[in-house]
């Protein structure tokens, strides 16, 4: 019965080169994962317990959600409440281009808060989402996007720098690069371990601690992101799934 209530809608806007999506009636728990893009969203209904970068809190209607690329997170329903959620996904290069239009400087911002409780900025997210769904004029959509980003840059972001996040161990970083380059292969723990001086157990613990997700979850996230990219290029879903 609950599954029949679930709805997921995804809309890619070619003018803005970003993705808008809505989740409604969702009761499932989302496992630990990350996105390659910026995520700007808000909770419309329901209550969730959110874990993000070793911190946790409850989020509910009116709360703004901000994820930087690769901010690992997961969430679960509270008291079985159904989640209603809207968001936009912005690729880093598109974010950088938009930020330059707003500030005159080219940089990729870093959101300093993942959750802003009872934020008025949720109205700006909703306005952008609605403009995309209505197929509004390019001017209206651009205004909505820039107005939203300007608010976020002023209140909840700082220029991204290498010091903002800790860098993984070089061996762990090389594993990430290898998995990104061989995402379609049937990789094994033996294969990954052979590339390091670690034992299997230590590799799993170290990778998960430094990256925020396990090697398997990291690989699955890369595959999903690749499949989504293929779909945006117009590749048929069956072919996109096979390529990922």
Predicted feature descriptions by range:
Residues 2-108, 134-137:
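N-terminal regulatory/effector-sensing and dimerization cores
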Residues 39-42, 171, 218:
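Residue-level recognition of specific faces of alpha-helices
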Residues 48, 137, 157, 184-185, ...:
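Generic structural signal for secondary-structure transition and capping sites
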Residues 76-78, 155-156, 208:
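Sigma70-family region 2
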Residues 92, 145, 172:
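Short amphipathic alpha-helical/adjacent loop interface patches that line ligand
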Residues 102-164, 177:
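Amphipathic alpha-helical segments enriched in hydrophobic/aromatic residues interleaved with Lys/Arg
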Residues 174, 178-182, 186-226, 230-235, ...:
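Basic/polar phosphate-binding segments, predominantly the helix-turn-helix DNA-binding elements
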């Amino acid at each position: 019965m609950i599954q029949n209530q679930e709805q997921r809608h995804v809309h890619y806007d070619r003018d803005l080169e970003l993705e808008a999506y809505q989740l409604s009636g969702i009761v499932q728990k989302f496992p630990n994962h990350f996105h390659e893009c910026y995520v700007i969203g808000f909770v419309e209904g329901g209550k969730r317990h959110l874990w993000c970068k070793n911190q946790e809190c409850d989020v509910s209607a009116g709360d703004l959600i901000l994820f930087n690329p690769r901010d690992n997170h997961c969430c679960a329903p509270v008291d079985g409440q159904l989640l209603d959620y809207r968001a936009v996904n912005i690729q880093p290069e598109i974010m950088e281009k938009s930020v330059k239009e707003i500030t005159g400087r080219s940089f990729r911002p870093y959101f300093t808060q993942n959750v802003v409780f009872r934020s008025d900025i949720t109205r700006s997210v909703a306005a952008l989402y609605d403009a995309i769904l209505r197929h509004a004029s390019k001017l209206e959509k651009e205004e909505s996007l820039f107005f939203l980003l300007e608010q976020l840059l002023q209140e909840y972001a700082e220029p991204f720098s290498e010091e903002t996040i800790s860098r993984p161990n070089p061996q762990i970083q090389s594993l990430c690069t290898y998995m990104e380059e061989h995402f379609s292969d049937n990789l094994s723990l033996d294969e990954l371990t052979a590339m390091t001086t670690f034992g299997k157990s230590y590799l799993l613990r170290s990778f998960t601690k430094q990256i925020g997700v396990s090697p398997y979850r990291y690989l699955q996230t890369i595959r999903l992101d690749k499949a989504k990219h293929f779909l945006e290029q117009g590749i048929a879903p069956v072919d996109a799934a096979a390529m990922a």
